[in-house]
From Swiss-Prot:
UniProt-annotated location(s): Cell membrane; Cytoplasm
Chain positions covered by the region annotation G3 motif: 201-210
Gene deletion effect: No visible phenoptype. Mice lacking Gnaq and Gna11 are embryonic lethal due to cardiomyocyte hypoplasia. Mice lacking Gnaq and with one single intact copy of Gna11, as well as mice lacking Gna11 and with one single intact copy of Gnaq die shortly after birth; lethality is caused by heart malformations. Newborns display craniofacial defects.
Protein's UniProt name: Guanine nucleotide-binding protein subunit alpha-11
Length: 359
């Protein structure tokens, strides 16, 4: 064999090896691209306290590992803090709304609760348990609770305050429902990925309060679906940040902004009209027409109220070709969310069949 032919032979081996490596790289790139496409990014949006964090907790219960005993124990302190926060809010409101205590000893109880530094609460001591129970049973405090739309009070207040005896027992372990009801304002961005039918659903929850929204911007890339939560029960409430602005008007303004963002042109929009259970209770004594004069349906009718609210949001969509998928939900009800998310998952997969190699 001549030197030239040997060199040609070596060269062709090198070329072959180089081609093989290139082919491997191309193959890996295609695989990476396909795998990236098999991840769906779901962005949870909505104003503060619309139920986004509760929705993520439900995904962990329904499609993830749920909450172990140790996980639940980690919520104990937060449950106690939620109880103190709720009673402090009512004690302050009693003063603002000039409501009198029926039982004289509750003035001292109110003072005792007021002086607690909630962030330092880690236990639920006997004297505080008694003070909170006595306050909650006071007709004055009950009147204050009935006027809760006039001040800021967590939706979970009644749930916890009517169950103080159970929560105050030695060795108390929060139930799944206790965990779902805990209110902790979301600061920053929380991601929860879960695997369904070989596809990763990456749910991203961003803080709903105004100060948190500027952090959203970098979440806007490659969003498969926008899941926008509206609290149906907020039609008569004002904002945490501004007490002369209606919460539902703020929610409408945010929804209008979101659906017209160019980033979301190709993202499907799913509207969750949440807290339907609270609406059913509230509509009996707080009339929708007092806050939205254009409502001409019957009073005390939850169905008419929610259909009106749905239409208000759907009418904000400027693009007649874009479908807005909607569901009425109760984020604290695991079975309701299981049922609704099964439908949502089917919708999302149907819309992404070709792109995700599902056909």
């Amino acid at each position: 064999m001549t030197l030239e032919s040997m060199m040609a032979c070596c060269l062709s081996d090198e070329v072959k090896e180089s081609k093989r490596i290139n082919a491997e790289i191309e193959k890996q790139l295609r695989r990476d691209k396909r795998d990236a496409r098999r991840e769906l990014k779901l962005l949870l949006l909505g104003t503060g306290e619309s139920g986004k964090s509760t929705f993520i907790k439900q995904m962990r219960i329904i499609h993830g590992a749920g909450y172990s005993e140790e996980d639940k124990r980690g919520f104990t302190k937060l449950v106690y803090q939620n109880i103190f926060t709720a009673m402090q809010a009512m004690v302050r409101a009693m003063e603002t709304l000039k409501i009198l205590y029926k039982y004289e000893q509750n003035k001292a109880n109110a003072l005792l609760i007021r002086e607690v530094d909630v962030e330092k609460v880690t236990t639920f001591e006997h004297q505080y348990v008694n003070a909170i129970k006595t306050l909650w049973s006071d007709p004055g405090v009950q009147e204050c609770y009935d006027r809760r739309r006039e001040f800021q009070l967590s939706d979970s207040a009644k749930y916890y305050l009517t169950d103080v005896d159970r929560i105050a027992t030695v060795g108390y372990l929060p139930t799944q429902q206790d965990v779902l009801r805990v209110r902790v304002p979301t600061t920053g961005i929380i991601e929860y990925p879960f695997d369904l039918e070989n596809i990763i659903f990456r749910m991203v929850d961003v803080g709903g309060q105004r100060s948190e929204r500027r952090k959203w911007i970098h979440c806007f890339e490659n969003v498969t679906s926008i899941m926008f939560l509206v609290a149906l029960s907020e039609y008569d409430q004002v904002l945490v940040e501004s007490d002369n602005e209606n919460r539902m008007e703020e929610s409408k303004a945010l929804f209008r902004t979101i659906i017209t963002y160019p980033w979301f042109q190709n993202s499907s929009v799913i509207l969750f009209l949440n807290k339907k259970d609270l609406l059913e209770d509230k509509i009996l004594h707080s009339h929708l027409v007092d806050y939205f004069p254009e409502f001409d349906g019957p009073q005390r009718d939850a169905q008419a109220a929610r259909e009106f609210i749905l239409k208000m949001f759907v009418d904000l969509n400027p693009d007649s070709d874009k479908i807005i998928y909607s569901h009425f939900t109760c984020a604290t009800d695991t079975e309701n969310i299981r049922f609704v998310f099964a439908a949502v998952k089917d919708t999302i997969l149907q819309l992404n069949l070709k792109e995700y190699n599902l056909v």
